[in-house]
């Protein structure tokens, strides 16, 4: 998979915003799924969730999946990676994972 890491801070900001939107959409759907007049809005949010999950599960390699699934889908924050990766390896792999994730979402 080809990836570009020209601007790591922009990639990090975009992925963080996607993670926040993903968490919001999941909560929104759970909260309002029983209200019938909200069904179009819920379906739209479900499509966005499916896109994020589909990219994560289907298009990312194992290393990218590990980081994106933990930070975007599970919403882990802080030093969650310390039991798995060294800090320098994590930051290097995270930059690559973010770039690949954003690239896949653009497709």
Language model: regions and residue ranges:
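Short, conserved sequence motifs enriched in acidic/basic residues, glycine, and aromatics
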Residues: 58-59, 84
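Short amphipathic alpha helix immediately N-terminal
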Residues: 59-75
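DNA major-groove recognition helices of helix-turn-helix
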Residues: 90-105
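Alpha-helical interaction segments
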Residues: 11-15, 70, 79-82
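N-terminal interaction/assembly modules
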Residues: 1-58
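Helix-turn-helix DNA-binding module
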Residues: 74-88
